[in-house]
Regions:
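Catalytic-core regions of core metabolic enzymes
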Residues: 1-503
C-alpha cells in the first residue's frame, strides 16, 4: 500500500492488466482504497489495510507462490511509478496542477481528466480556466456539476466531453478507447462510447472515414442536461469544411433534446442513430432516424452517395447449419458483452425478433435480472457490478471468460452472443483469450455468434481476431447488430432472419 499516492483509473487498469499477465497470477488489482474497493479486497481475504483512505494506492495479487507474487507486484509498481523516472529532465518536478502542466506543454489544447468523481469538476474547471477543451473520463460526477461545467465551457467556446466519455478522435488523434480510423468527411457526436467506436470503424471499413469524433457523455442528451454539449459539437462540425455529414449516436435520448441538437446544424445534413427510438416517418427533426448503429452508418453512406458492402453474405447459410446442430430444447440466447452500447443495441434487435430481453442494463426497468427460465439475457460486463476491483473486460477478458463458463453451457442455450472490441487501450489479443471457451461451447451443442469491432489499422489486427474466432467455430458477422440478428435466427429456427432487412 502507498498512502497519499493517487493514480488515475486508466493507469490503474493498465497496471492491473500487466500484473495479471504474469505467470502464476490468478487475480490482480491496482486500485485506490475507496470503501468499495477495500470491501472487495476484504472479500478476497486482503483485510489488513490499516488506515487506508481513497488517496492510498493498493496493489494486490493472488499468486501460485511468493516468487510469482513478487514478480507481478514489481511489474505493477514499475508501471505505476514509471512516470516519475522517465521525465525528459529528471530534476524537473512533476506538475501538480493543470497550470503547471500547461507551462510544460504550452501548445496543448485538450486535457484528459480521470480522477474520482467528487474531484472531477474541480480539475475540469481548472482545465477550462487554462483555455483547454476537456475529455472528462471520470464517472460519478454530480448532475448539477456536469451542467455547470458545460454551461461554462459553452461560454468559453470550449468542449467538455463527458463525464464518462471514454472515446474521442480529435484531429486524427484517438483519446481513451479509440480505434485507428482513416480521415474522412463524417463528424460523429456520440453519447455512447462503443457506439462511437462501432460507427467509426464501420465507416473506416467502408472506405469513408471520419473528420472528428466527439464523445459528450451518456447523460448529455437527457432531459436534464438537454444536449448542451452535443449542440456545441454539432455547431462546430457544421462550421468545419471537412465535415459533409454529421452522425448523432445515442441510446434513446430525450426527444426535445435530440431535436435541438439536430437543429443546431444549419448547413450540414444530420443522421440520428438513436438506439430503439421511433418517430413518425422514420425522421426526427428532419434527420433520418436509425434504430441501430448499423442502420445509422448505412444512412450516412447513402447520404454521401457511397456504396455499402453486402452485410448479409453467407449468414443465412451459417444460421441454417447452426440450427441443424441444435437439440430441440435449446431456445435461449445468452449475450456476454464488453461494450455497453453494443449490449443495448443487441437488446433492441433481439426484442424485435424474440420478445423481451433481460439484462443488468435493460431497455425497461421491469426487464432487470433475474430472468425467467428460457428468456433471452444480455449482460453488460463493463458495468460496475462486474468491474469492482478488477479491470474493464475490454482490458482484461478473464472475467468474461469465467462468466461464460458459468452461464453459457446450459442445456437450454441455443446461441451465445458476444463482442470483441479492438483498439488502443484494449487487450492485445481479446479473441485469443476467449477462443478456447467458445470452442467448448460449440462442442457442447450451442452456437456462438461474435462480432469484432475494429479496423485493419488497430494494433490487434482485425483479420487476425476474426480468424481466431472462426477457427474456434464462431459465426463472425460484419456488424454488431447483424450478430444479434443471427443469434435470434438460430434460436427461433428461422435462418432467413439472419439476412433479412432490419425489423
Amino acid at each position: 500500500m502507498f498512502p497519499g499516492t493517487y493514480r488515475d483509473s486508466l493507469l490503474l487498469l493498465s497496471a492491473t492488466r500487466a500484473m495479471h499477465e504474469e505467470d502464476g497470477i490468478g487475480w490482480a488489482a491496482a486500485v485506490m482504497a475507496t470503501p468499495a474497493n477495500v470491501a472487495d479486497l476484504a472479500g478476497r481475504g486482503i483485510g489488513d489495510l490499516g488506515a487506508a483512505d481513497a488517496n492510498a494506492l493498493v496493489l494486490a495479487v493472488q499468486a501460485a507462490d511468493g516468487q510469482a507474487a513478487d514478480e507481478a507486484l514489481d511489474r505493477g509498481r514499475a508501471l505505476l511509478f514509471a512516470a516519475e523516472g522517465t521525465r525528459q529532465d529528471p530534476g524537473q518536478a512533476e506538475p501538480q496542477t493543470i497550470g503547471e502542466a500547461v507551462a510544460l506543454l504550452p501548445d496543448a489544447n485538450v486535457a484528459v481528466v480521470s480522477v474520482p468523481g467528487p474531484y472531477a469538476a474541480i480539475a475540469a474547471h481548472s482545465a477550462l480556466t487554462a483555455g483547454l477543451h476537456v475529455l472528462l473520463f471520470s464517472d460519478n460526477v454530480p448532475l448539477d456539476e456536469e451542467i455547470a461545467l458545460k454551461d461554462r465551457a459553452s461560454g468559453l467556446g470550449k468542449l467538455v466531453m463527458g463525464p464518462g466519455a471514454g472515446t474521442a478522435v480529435l484531429g486524427g488523434v484517438g483519446l481513451g478507447f479509440a480505434n485507428a480510423v482513416r480521415p474522412g468527411s463524417v463528424g460523429v457526436v456520440a453519447a455512447a462510447g462503443t457506439g462511437a467506436q462501432e460507427v467509426m470503424t464501420l465507416l473506416d471499413r467502408w472506405g469513408i472515414g471520419v473528420s472528428q469524433v466527439v464523445g459528450v457523455g451518456g447523460r448529455d442528451l437527457s432531459a436534464q442536461v438537454g444536449g448542451r454539449m452535443a449542440r456545441d459539437a454539432v455547431r462546430a462540425l457544421d462550421a468545419d469544411p471537412g465535415t459533409e455529414v454529421i452522425l448523432l449516436v445515442s441510446k434513446p435520448p430525450d426527444p426535445d433534446a435530440a431535436r435541438t441538437v439536430i437543429d443546431a446544424s444549419e448547413h450540414t445534413p444530420v443522421v440520428a442513430a438513436c438506439l430503439g427510438m421511433s418517430a413518425a416517418g422514420g425522421m426526427l427533426a428532419g434527420a433520418p432516424l436509425a434504430v441501430t448503429l448499423e442502420d445509422g452508418a448505412v444512412a450516412v453512406a447513402r447520404t454521401l452517395g457511397k456504396p455499402v458492402p453486402d452485410l448479409t453474405e453467407g449468414l443465412a447459410g451459417a444460421a441454417a447449419q447452426a440450427v441443424d446442430r441444435l437439440d430441440g430444447g435449446r431456445t435461449a440466447v445468452r449475450g456476454f458483452y464488453t461494450g455497453g452500447t453494443l449490449c443495448y443495441e443487441a437488446q433492441v434487435v433481439l426484442t424485435a425478433l424474440l420478445g423481451p430481453v433481460y439484462s443488468n442494463l435493460p431497455l425497461r426497468t421491469d426487464l432487470a435480472l433475474p430472468a425467467p427460465a428460457g428468456a433471452p439475457v444480455c449482460l453488460d460486463l463493463g458495468e460496475e457490478e462486474y468491474t469492482q476491483g478488477r479491470p474493464h473486460p475490454m482490458i482484461d477478458p478473464a472475467a468474461r471468460r469465467d462468466i461464460m463458463r458459468e452461464q453459457a453451457f446450459g442445456d437450454d442455450v441455443a446461441a451465445v452472443l458476444l463482442d470483441v472490441v479492438l483498439g488502443y487501450g484494449s487487450h492485445p489479443d481479446p479473441a485469443g483469450e476467449i477462443a478456447g471457451t467458445c470452442a467448448d461451447i460449440v462442442a457442447g451443442g450451442a452456437a456462438v455468434v461474435g462480432y469484432v469491432l475494429g479496423t485493419d489499422g488497430d494494433p490487434q489486427g482485425l483479420d487476425v481476431q476474426r480468424r481466431t474466432l472462426r477457427d474456434a467455430g464462431v459465426i463472425v458477422t460484419p456488424t454488431a447488430a447483424r450478430a444479434a440478428r443471427v443469434a435470434a435466427a438460430i434460436a427461433a429456427r428461422r435462418p432467413a432472419l439472419a439476412a433479412a432487412a432490419p425489423a
